[in-house]
Amino acid sequence: AKDLHIRWSLYKNRLFADDNELVATFEDAKAKTTCNSKGQAAIRQTLTVDNVAAWTAEAPNVYVVVGELMQGKKVLETISFQTGFRTVEIKDTPASQDEFGLAGRYYYINGKPVKLKGVNRHDTNPLTGKVISREQMEHEIMLMKRANINHIRTSHYPNDPYFYYLCNKYGIYLESEANIESHEYFYGKASLSHVPEFQAAHVDRVMTMAHQLVNNPSIVIWSLGNEAGPGHNFVVAYDSLKAYDASRPVQYERNNDIVDMGSNQYPSIAWTRDAVKGRMGIKYPFHISEYAHSMGNAVGNLVDYWEAMESTNFFMGGAIWDWIDQSMYNYTKEGKRYLAYGGDFGDTPNDGQFVMNGIIFGDEQPKPQYYEVKKVY
């Protein structure tokens, strides 16, 4: 084929809805591009849009980009994707520009410091396991919004594209995490993060995530993975990711030195109270990637963490471990269904209730912890 060009259209969605209106179009039928021997070509075009509405978790203004491959006036192929207009940055801030009068390295969305009030979330359903419906995804987002949760860490893998669509639409700040976890090798010399033969796999998993998801405005942090060692393979993965997308900061809890921000897991309240002052030898801004482990009668001291974190801007926030119990349905001898966990199926060995850490039950009913989180957040 020859004499092909692309027509771009930009639509603005109504807030929290999918109906939209045309904002702008761009079509340059005279632009010339040469394809390679495989018939491929990369085309970069710029469309300037005035008076855009910014995307935030409170006002998630979503735009839809439609690209049409044209031959003359004939449409050969069409693609579309969601996007949004918002900035994410980490910058050194003088005391005169900080609401608390403290100079520091802070995290900003659309030029304003933001607190990420979050949860870690796994895909789970007590009947279908790791396969969940779109209806469940939306119900979970609604429950989160009602509990003042504005942030999710996609522990520990990228989610279904529809989940990102929902987070774009309803307003959730995402830390999108690559599907890398190898802590059975622990963090010493045996860690796969050090092994050269696994370097390509580390890079591939990070870049596959980025290539698929880069246009989603809800993603405000990339994560290189979870508990997978501190080695050089993650340095290469970070460099590859930043070369592709420099618009978002990158987090990796197992090696803060190689990424853009600090993070840890399960710090004490006493440590947090000291660290938020900005004088500790850690990388700022800081995000607690896992805290407030919610097994059993838990989350009672969440307010103590947040009184500390909200006293300065050195901490961006954190993500509770975790959102939903990873239970499965089982049945009594009488045929009564119940939410079961390790050991209830006659399995030996087992981890007992160790996946029952959610602030909601596996059937999406809120626990008492849910209401505590709602109050504090």
Predicted regions span which residues?
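Secreted/periplasmic carbohydrate-active enzymes, especially glycoside hydrolases
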Residues: 1-160, 166, 170-171, 205, ...
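Substrate-binding/catalytic cleft of secreted carbohydrate-active enzymes
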Residues: 141-144, 151-361
